[in-house]
Amino acid sequence: MKHFPQGSKLLAFFLGAAIAFTGCKKVDSPIAPPPVYTLDQLYGQAVGDAMVADSSEISDALWPITPDNPDLQWKTINGQSYVLLASFMRYPDSYPAGDSITTTWGEAWLFIPKQMKDRIGPSFKPDSDTIMRICQLLGLPPANQKSNTHIAQMWVKAAALYRPAGNPAIDTRRSGAVLVNNVSPAYSTWFNNYIIFAYYRPLTSATDAHYPWTRMGYTYDWAPDASKVGLSEYVLQASSGAWVEKVSRAADFFR
């Protein structure tokens, strides 16, 4: 029979315990990668999120349409003051450069050209999908055969604009999603009808879509990893006059 010194017995005991503990150690599960969503899924999530608005989503950085806003361009035409805004559209022939137009087809949703250029212009590369990125920024469906293709910059009267938000005033820097008390009955009707149009109307074709209308004065940017606070948005009333400054293909707008 072999005899071991007392210290050797203790060492053997602790080594055996360590081996046993190591053998029973829990193996951590690998971290699951984040889910990958399709463009249609991302857009659908944006619509669902925009449908339910709360005060934490109010932006204090809306661009006001005021003469003292240095980011705006103004021009006097026939003795009247006009501000330069832009429309993302797909009927360039309806916007003859240098000529006046009347929006007989209905209201036009507009944005400030400089704000769009500042927001996404630096991110574009030669192989970028410009149409898709604009669609994301403006809260429009993923690019498809019915997507807009051109941007028309035009001079419009500030008095013919309203902000499609709880507060339609265009000279403020913030708006909630709930109607303020002093809106006109006509605007209240428009606002409530547009809620139905944006979220609940029946879709009749594969290219029809609901919209992530925030009701807080900014577009919903649904691009992955982007702030959902997009561009300040404005609506030009139906049958309003405007002067077309320039029409560009979407990619050329940023050059």
Language-model features, listed with the residues they occupy:
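A general structural signal for short secondary-structure junctions and capping/turn motifs
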Residues: K2-H3, W74-K75, L140-K146
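Short active-site loop/helix that positions an aromatic residue
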Residues: K114-L137
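Sec-dependent N-terminal signal peptides
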Residues: L10-A18
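Conserved NAD+-utilizing ADP-ribose enzyme module
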Residues: S29, L138-R255
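Solvent-exposed loop/turn segments at secondary-structure junctions
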Residues: R90-Y91, Q115-D118, A159-Y162
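C-terminal motif of bacterial Sec signal peptides marking the signal peptidase cleavage site
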Residues: A20-G23
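ADP-ribose/NAD+-binding catalytic cleft of ART/PARP-like enzymes
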Residues: V27-F111
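Bacterial N-terminal signal peptides that target proteins for export
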Residues: M1-L11
